[in-house]
Design a protein with these regions (language model features):
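Catalytic core of the SET domain in histone-lysine N-methyltransferases
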Residues: 43-82, 135-286, 322
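Residue-level marker of beta-strand positions
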Residues: 94-97, 279
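Conserved, structured regulatory domains from eukaryotic proteins
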Residues: 118-133, 141, 147-148
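Residue-level recognition of conserved beta-strand edge/terminus positions
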Residues: 98-99, 105, 242, 283
Length: 486
């Protein structure tokens, strides 16, 4: 029976690949990577580098921004680069607008010299190839922009083996390795099919180069904008994240350039009021877990609800009722033999988790609920305890899985908390400690929930009792009535 339940996470990629890590609202926006999360009043701390000044001049020359009265300018901030307000701004005020001709997306690739070669590729792969080719071209139109992009971030895809060892036991480690394996497989494919046969068009591209491009896109690309699948927007992608901002609404939009203009613009707004000299921030995604933030951007937050753990539950193909259970699951929105449930620290269990657990564990004398006569009502029955044996089984299996997962970490929660309290940690170690401590807290929460449920097994009302009550065969004291007295 234990083989029917597992706790793990699957790699999650761009929207072209079905994400398995989270069932919460999927991210609609990927942005630049701050190494840490600072206060809303984080000021610029230094003069921009020559590369940033060259980039700014390029934007001015192209008419993207006004050289005389800019609303924001790039600046050195604790996160790296950010957008610094040049005057006071009100909430929802436009920060910048970038015309479509200055976006980098699959259309940009299609109209380039390598466009014909990239027609059948995944959008992110084609844009990654474009970035690497343009980066090697000293005369590239995009050179000023490419020069300000970081060589790497604190995203876990850039970590060394020693750094990754700090993630031992975590779902984030499995996800990171899965993502890197996925990127490598895509690289080997295009290397053989596109890069090597067209050496005159491409520089010498390595796996590390391709990982760099993937990381840039994952952290900076706006995705699922209206009519757009994947877009890099110079200047706009310097906007940093701040956990103090608790809304994602109205931070950006695609709009027309005006009554007599055919231009399409990306418009970025500030979600809060900002003083001149302060950094402008947005909220990247309220639905992301710390593991997702670490993978995508290279930071974590202290908010408890950023800590999540994914329970992976499976209907075994060897189950004699496999077909019936699969049909019932799919009829209730859980497609396929595997289902993923995100458990968030401090939150209740997902509504479909217990019914699905009961379904997977269903067997023996409870299997009658799988008969076709119950097909339209079975999920309603599964929302309540079916039998003591069924409920006891799911409690035991889930608790065993939690204990097994907890034994895979090399530190305890107390040891992690002591490290975090001590401060002065390397940024990547701080991420690792934060993620593994958060995962363990969630696992302990899950274990506690099912431990308490085990203690209530004798007090729960099961299907047969409910059925007898419905038939009027249970007395006021809970005794079964076999016949009515004359």
């Amino acid at each position: 029976m234990a083989s029917l339940f597992s706790i793990s996470s699957s790699p999650f990629f761009f929207s072209s690949v079905k994400p398995h890590f989270s069932q919460r609202k999927r991210p609609t926006l990927h942005l630049t990577v701050p190494f840490t999360v600072k206060s809303l009043l984080s000021p610029a701390t230094d003069t921009p580098s020559p590369a940033v000044q060259t980039f700014w001049q390029w934007l001015c020359d192209k008419g993207v921004v006004s050289a005389n009265s800019p609303v924001v300018k790039p600046g050195i901030v604790p996160e790296g680069l950010g957008l610094i307000a040049q005057r006071d701004m009100s909430r929802n005020e436009v920060v910048l607008e970038v015309p479509k001709k200055f976006w980098i997306n699959p259309d940009t690739v299609a109209s380039s010299e390598i466009g014909k070669l990239c027609g059948g590729l995944k959008p992110w792969v084609s844009v990654a190839l474009f970035l690497l080719r343009e980066k090697s071209n000293k005369d590239s139109l995009w050179r000023s922009y490419l020069e300000i992009l970081p060589e790497q971030t604190n995203s876990t895809i850039y970590w060394s083996e020693e750094e990754l060892s700090e993630l031992q036991g975590t779902q984030l480690l499995n996800t990171t390795l899965g993502v890197k394996e996925y990127v490598q497989s895509e690289f080997l494919k295009i290397k053989e099919e596109i890069i090597l046969p067209n050496k005159h068009l491409f520089p010498s591209i390595t796996m590390d180069d391709f990982i760099w491009a993937f990381g840039i896109l994952r952290s900076r690309a706006f995705s699922r904008l209206r009519g757009q699948n994947l877009v890099l927007i110079p200047l706009a992608d310097l906007i940093n994240h701040n956990s103090s901002i608790t809304t994602e609404d109205n931070a950006w939009e695609i709009k027309g350039g005006g009554l007599f203009s055919r231009d399409v613009l990306f418009s970025l707004r500030t979600p809060v009021s900002v003083k001149s000299g302060e950094q402008v921030y947005i909220q990247y995604d309220l639905g992301k877990s710390n593991a997702e933030l670490a993978l995508d951007y290279g930071f974590v937050e202290s908010r408890s609800d950023r800590n999540a753990y994914t329970l992976t539950l499976e209907i075994s193909e060897s189950d004699p009722f496999f077909g019936d259970k699969l049909d019932i699951a799919e009829s209730n929105g859980l497609v396929g033999e595997t289902a993923y449930f995100d458990i968030v620290l401090g939150h209740s269990l997902p509504p479909a988790l217990l019914p699905y657990l009961r379904l997977v564990a269903l067997g023996g004398t409870d299997a009658f609920l799988l008969e076709s006569i119950f097909r339209n009502s079975v999920w309603g029955h599964l929302e309540l305890p079916v039998s003591r044996a069924n409920e006891e089984l799911i409690c035991r299996v889930v608790r065993n899985a939690c204990r097994t997962a907890l034994s895979g970490y090399k530190t305890t929660i107390e040891e992690d908390e002591k490290l975090l309290e001590g401060g002065n940690l390397d940024p990547r170690l701080e991420i690792a400690v934060g993620v593994r401590a958060g995962e363990k807290r969630v696992l302990e929460q899950i274990d506690e929930i099912f431990k308490n449920r085990e203690l209530e097994l004798d007090e729960l009302e099961y299907y047969q009792e409910r059925r007898l009550k419905d038939l009027g065969l249970v007395g006021e004291q809970g005794d079964i009535i076999f016949w009515e007295p004359k």
